[in-house]
């Protein structure tokens, strides 16, 4: 995990009903690199989005889904999800504006 830069940590935002409801409390949900830890996620959010201050980070590992194609069975890749709580005086994240 030595060569992962901050822009490689956050892969994409998670846009669901629950994550949209949490945005009112300044909680934002992202899919992150599977090897990223909480401090790396905090640093990446603060560097990528100017004016944001992270209060806490909650992470969860998600197993891959079972898929079939004919007789062949397999699984999709594992993913990691992070819920980032911003401080009260922090700016909003612009990527979620207008959703």
Curated annotation (Swiss-Prot):
Taxonomic superkingdom: Bacteria
SUPFAM superfamilies: Ribosomal proteins S24e, L23 and L15e (SSF54189)
InterPro entries according to UniProt: Nucleotide-bd_a/b_plait_sf, Ribosomal_uL23-like, Ribosomal_uL23/eL15/eS24_sf
GO cellular component, one term: ribosome
Gene Ontology biological process terms, A to Z: translation
Sorted UniProt keywords: Ribonucleoprotein, Ribosomal protein, RNA-binding, rRNA-binding
Keyword Secreted attached: no
Xref: Pfam families: Ribosomal_L23
Keyword Nucleotidyltransferase applies: no
Described purpose of this protein according to its UniProt entry: One of the early assembly proteins it binds 23S rRNA. One of the proteins that surrounds the polypeptide exit tunnel on the outside of the ribosome. Forms the main docking site for trigger factor binding to the ribosome.
UniProt subunit comment: Part of the 50S ribosomal subunit. Contacts protein L29, and trigger factor when it is bound to the ribosome.
Family: Belongs to the universal ribosomal protein uL23 family.
Name assigned to this protein: Large ribosomal subunit protein uL23
């Amino acid at each position: 995990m030595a060569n992962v830069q901050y822009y490689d940590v956050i892969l994409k935002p998670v846009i669901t009903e629950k994550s949209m409801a949490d945005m009112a409390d300044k909680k934002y949900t992202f899919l992150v690199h599977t090897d990223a830890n909480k401090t790396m996620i905090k640093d990446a959010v603060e560097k990528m989005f100017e004016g944001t201050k992270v209060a806490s980070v909650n992470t969860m590992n998600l197993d891959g889904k079972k898929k079939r194609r004919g007789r062949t069975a397999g699984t999709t890749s594992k993913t990691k999800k992070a819920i980032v709580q911003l401080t009260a005086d922090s700016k909003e994240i612009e990527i979620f504006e207008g959703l």
